[in-house]
Amino acid sequence: MTGSLIMLRVHKRKFLVRTTTSIAAAALLLGGIAISTTSATAASPSAIAKGIALAKSRLAEYTKLPTFTAPGAPFNARKIMKNKVIFSIPVNSSDQFVQTLENGMAAVAKKIGYKFIDYQNSGSPAQWVAGMEEAISEHVSLIDLLSGINPATLAPQIKAAKAAGIKVVSSDTYGIGQPSDPILNGTVNAPYGETARLQADWMTVHSNGKGHILLIGSSDVAASPFGIAAEQSEFKQVCPACKVYTIDVPVADWASETQTQVQAQLQAHPNLDYVSPVYDSQSQFIIPAITTANKIGKVHIVSYDGTPFVLGDMQTEKGSIVQMDVGEDLEWVSLAIADNEMRIVGGLPAVANEEIPLYLWDAANVNNAGRPPQNNKGYGAAELTGYYKLWGLTK
């Protein structure tokens, strides 16, 4: 894996621990795993209750099926995209998450009537360079760098594309509000900060404001510091009595290090209530650690992505291990990417937030995702009507 070259955002990857806390933070290094600790403060019962109430109020919105909020002004998509071409270079075509987004973007292109090229590759930077060169030679309208390609690794090619009048956009890589590479013409950002805050809110409520929590970041992912900082900040606000430990296991080390490190943390901190990886696919290496420690029903997993196999674990275990997972409709994400990129192609103002909604999956509603769970199932279909109307489509 080329972790140093890729800003990963896919179903088997994602966050970092470089944050410091305003309370008391201790950092050390054990076996190459960075560890930080946020100590609980002496919070009064009223402060704890206030935090729980605030967390509950923030969670409530995300227990309802998503509704559509227009991210920007309406426009005539077919007029703007006539004779236009979008060339998408995904981080790795073999990843199910990435290919689902590509398929959704291709469906939008077919509906609107413009050409969409999905540049298949296996995650090699050399292939990304070749894709950029092909896009430039074909004089496309916009190049989409999807789901984690670091723009810095393609700086010469991006400059050449822009010199040729081609716009270059990074999609589903940066979090909303996170600074992006200025070499880009635009971005389509993901709600990474909000997902992190929701995880903190959930663990606050379900630990009665006194949780002992292990966060797991992955330092080879660009959005990691952003998400971890958001989660730490939320705990400080809603759970002053919580004790939060944070370790870093790079994606490249997930298979070899996660179980060992989680087992070590369970032994070092026997009162742990939650293990919370920023990306839910890491749970496949966490569940064995919880099982080996005989902590099923005592230590739960809370995470983000709504990955089908993780929701399947939730169904099988009835929430006894994976308790909650923040999900997003990948069809909605595809439509959001297409929306902002069409705006950029047409010279319209880009939108900073595509209003991609989130939805909380738990044991009470997870069967709505299908048995077995499927991408895009259980979220409703408000996005199709909403975006089609926004784009001036009558049929």
Task: Please tell me what each predicted stretch does.
Residues 43-104, 108, 117-129, 134, ...:
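Extracytoplasmic "Venus flytrap"
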Residues 43-84, 329-395:
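Hinge/cleft segment of the Venus flytrap/periplasmic-binding protein
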Residues 71-72, 116-139, 247-268, 283-285:
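Structural motif
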Residues 86-87, 105, 195-248, 341-374:
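An alpha-beta-alpha
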Residues 128, 186-213, 225-226, 258-259, ...:
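Hydrophobic alpha-helical segments within soluble ligand-binding/sensing domains
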Residues 139-148, 167-171, 214-215, 246-247, ...:
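Periplasmic-binding protein-like
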Residues 147-162, 231, 250-313:
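Hydrophobic alpha-helical
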Residues 151-152, 156-194, 212, 307-319:
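Flexible loop/hinge segments that line or gate small-molecule binding clefts
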